[in-house]
């Protein structure tokens, strides 16, 4: 369904709240207020925003596409997972993990083998008719400077989006899959004090907690991430989709081994 994103005097439309509360997230209304902007999300189809004096427009865009869309997902009985998503024209595979865990590197390895990009940073995931479905996001990939140069696009033609991490927004229209796909696997990436690449399949409550802890809004929601609207969907996802963890050593470069471990998993899952 379409989403209307409009500028409005949101600051005077927010529900009453204590001064130390900066957001609300419910099935009917979601809102956010910070130094950059005020956001009001309603009915699963409307995001209204107000850029505050001195607010950064790039930060505003990030809040709308990240936090605003995540609140919208909840109102649609979906969850927004912090993940990269790729597809093989039949099913989707989701790569979750904190920043720096290797999601972009693993995604690029799959794209090089003919897979299609569905999402770079966030995907709407829902449970319908006994099936977990992932929606495509935007046909762009956030890449660091070296990877952006390797993509073949002149840097001055790209959007520079992250000074702290030196990243660019790179178009991927020719390899983008805009179709909703059933999810066949979730792979969570991370670094840990291990001596070699470590693979483990999560079961039961461990898989459930892993889904909850990879919600896009997890840091904002804190303990509220276990509210029925999000936890219920995560429980269904974890019960239907195999969830794996791949950990790599803190220091050694094990990129190739992580990639091959992931391919070994996804080649077997149907």
Features from the language model and the residues they span:
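Short Lys/Arg-enriched alpha/beta "domain-start" segment
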Residues: 1-15
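Charged, amphipathic alpha-helical linker segments immediately N-terminal to NTP-binding catalytic cores
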Residues: 26-75
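Pre-Walker A adenine-sensing motif
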Residues: 72-85
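Glycine-rich, often acidic-flanked micro-motifs
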Residues: 84, 88-97, 113-270
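Walker A (P-loop) phosphate-binding loop of P-loop NTPases
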Residues: 100
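Post-Walker A alpha-helix
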Residues: 106-107
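Aromatic pocket-lining residues of Rossmann-like dinucleotide-binding sites
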Residues: 110
């Amino acid at each position: 369904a379409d989403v209307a994103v409009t500028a409005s005097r949101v600051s005077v439309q927010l529900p009453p709240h204590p001064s130390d509360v900066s957001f609300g997230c419910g099935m009917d209304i979601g809102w956010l207020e910070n130094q950059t902007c005020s956001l009001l999300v309603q009915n699963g189809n409307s995001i209204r925003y107000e850029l505050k004096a001195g607010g950064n427009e790039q930060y505003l865009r990030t809040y709308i596409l990240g936090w605003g869309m995540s609140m919208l997902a909840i109102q649609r009985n979906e969850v927004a997972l912090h993940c990269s998503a790729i597809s093989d024209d039949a099913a989707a595979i989701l790569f979750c993990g904190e920043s720096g865990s290797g999601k972009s590197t693993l995604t690029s390895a799959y794209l090089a083998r003919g897979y299609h990009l569905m999402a770079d940073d966030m995907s709407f995931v829902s449970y319908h008719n006994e099936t977990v479905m992932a929606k495509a996001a935007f046909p762009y990939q956030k890449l660091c400077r070296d990877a952006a140069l390797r993509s073949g696009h002149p840097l001055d033609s790209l959007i520079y989006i992250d000074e702290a991490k030196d990243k660019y927004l790179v178009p991927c229209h020719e390899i983008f899959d805009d179709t909703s796909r059933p999810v066949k696997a979730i792979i969570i990436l991370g670094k840990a004090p291990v001596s070699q690449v470590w693979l483990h399949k999560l079961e039961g409550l461990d898989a459930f907690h892993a889904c909850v802890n990879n919600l896009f809004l997890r840091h904002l929601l804190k303990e509220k991430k276990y509210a029925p609207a999000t936890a219920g969907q995560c429980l269904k996802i974890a019960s239907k989709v195999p969830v794996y963890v791949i950990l790599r050593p803190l220091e050694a470069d094990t990129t190739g081994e992580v990639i091959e471990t992931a391919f070994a998993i996804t080649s077997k899952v149907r």
